């Protein structure tokens, strides 16, 4: 029922852009409440696949030099359940990674996204597999949503050859078709994403690139360079700042002169989104994709979200913020709890049915993690270092190593 392989296409329905710009005075501050969308329950069909219309909160968006997206969204029961399942899987996978790291089975850098699941899931449910996604080192959820398996992602974290990057990339460097990482250098993925968007425009078609980075990376010069080139060439690029309030241990207000990251493009329109509401994210990205593939050029989105854990596994996450702040966000703004509440209240599923989805997601993750843990460690041979570098048939005759006698010959 919840197979990633058989999920139906999520092409956006036509959205008409309003002709009148909304005065600044009419705009509201974006909330992080995950359960404010409403629906007329009498319009919800019996069929799992028949669409119905929900009304998003008036505090879902803020805009800059842009007409706001529609505050309505067409969904089906099946889509709502799938989004819920996906978020539970991503969270359980991240919690498994947390456990394995503390057991010293995962080493090195490891950045988890517990609390931020609505962004990865909402983005994927708004685009097509022919679109491209590139993000930062906090990438596990995106790797899964782009088509990776829990087994291959955990296997990668464990350094196994069956991992999504053959055990060579680790936490920060995961790749699959249409997903270009997972990038370890702060902000470095942004100009690469602009290049992907350039390729899409060059080859034609209604495709877009979703380019994600954090608030901590937003002050990087290369981000602004990418903005300039994307606007200059009118590229189909959806830049997106995942504003989780802290760049490592530094709050946004202490590091950025302008914390309205959606306005950072200056000459590029911007859209601020409630990143704790998976439905608001889906609606915003659907709107953004249609905007950009119609030839309007790039957009800068800001997803207002929150990470429950530290910046990385080496950060307890409580030296620069209070435990009370974290608990308040968990208890009042959790993206999974918010969607669960709406699914039950709207009669999309009963409480028992939702528990069944929870159970299925947890069982799937547990099975996949166990399979990853059972993978044999790779042989520590130098030969592995020279594999997966060149496309087969394009290799040079040899590669020299650190010393004159350390030479690897391709067969």
Curated annotation (Swiss-Prot):
It catalyses: N(6)-[(R)-lipoyl]-L-lysyl-[protein] + pyruvate + H(+) = N(6)-[(R)-S(8)-acetyldihydrolipoyl]-L-lysyl-[protein] + CO2. Mg(2+) binds at residues 215, 244, 246. It holds the Pfam family E1_dh. Pyruvate binds at residues 111, 137-138, 184, 186, 215-217, 244, 246. It comes from Chaetomium thermophilum (strain DSM 1495 / CBS 144.50 / IMI 039719) (Thermochaetoides thermophila). The lineage of its organism: Eukaryota, Fungi, Dikarya, Ascomycota, Pezizomycotina. It is an enzyme of class 1 (oxidoreductase). Its EC number is 1.2.4.1. This is Pyruvate dehydrogenase E1 component subunit alpha, mitochondrial.
């Amino acid at each position: 029922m919840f197979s990633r392989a058989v999920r139906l296409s999520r092409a956006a329905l036509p959205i008409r852009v309003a002709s009148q710009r909304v005065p600044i005075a009419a705009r509201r501050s974006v909330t992080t409440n995950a359960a404010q969308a409403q629906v007329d329950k009498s319009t919800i069909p019996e069929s799992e696949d028949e669409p119905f219309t929900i009304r998003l909160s008036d505090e879902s968006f803020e805009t800059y030099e842009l007409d706001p997206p529609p505050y309505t969204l067409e969904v089906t029961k099946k889509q709502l359940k799938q989004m819920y399942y996906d978020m539970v899987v991503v969270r359980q996978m991240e919690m498994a990674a947390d456990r394995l790291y503390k057991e010293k089975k995962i080493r090195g850098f490891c950045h988890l996204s517990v609390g931020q699941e609505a962004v990865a899931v909402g983005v994927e449910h708004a685009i097509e597999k022919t679109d491209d996604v590139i993000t930062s080192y906090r990438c596990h959820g995106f790797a899964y949503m782009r088509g990776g398996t829990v087994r291959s992602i955990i296997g990668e974290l464990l350094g196994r050859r069956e991992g999504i990057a053959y055990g060579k990339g680790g936490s920060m460097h995961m790749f699959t078709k249409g997903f270009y990482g997972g990038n370890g250098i702060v902000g470095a993925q942004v100009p690469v994403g602009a290049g992907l968007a350039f390729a899409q425009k060059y080859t034609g078609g209604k495709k877009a690139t979703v380019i994600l980075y954090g608030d901590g990376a937003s002050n990087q010069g290369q981000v602004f360079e990418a903005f300039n080139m994307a606007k200059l060439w009118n590229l189909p690029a959806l830049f997106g700042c995942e504003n989780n309030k802290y760049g490592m241990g530094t709050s946004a207000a202490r590091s950025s002169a302008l914390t309205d990251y959606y306005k950072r493009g200056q000459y590029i329109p911007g859209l601020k989104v409630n990143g704790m509401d998976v439905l608001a994210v889906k609606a915003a990205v659907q709107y953004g994709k249609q905007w950009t593939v119609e030839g309007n050029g790039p957009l800068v989105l800001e997803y207002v979200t929150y990470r429950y854990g530290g910046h990385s596994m080496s950060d307890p996450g409580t030296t620069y913020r209070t435990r009370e702040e974290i608990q308040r966000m968990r208890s009042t703004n959790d993206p999974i709890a918010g969607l669960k509440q709406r699914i039950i209240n709207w009669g999309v599923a009963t409480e028992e049915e939702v528990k069944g989805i929870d159970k299925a997601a947890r069982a799937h993750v547990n099975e996949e993690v166990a399979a990853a843990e059972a993978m044999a460690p790779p042989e520590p041979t130098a030969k592995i270092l020279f594999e997966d570098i060149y496309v087969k048939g394009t290799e040079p005759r040899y590669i020299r190593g650190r010393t004159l006698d350390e030479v690897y010959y391709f067969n």
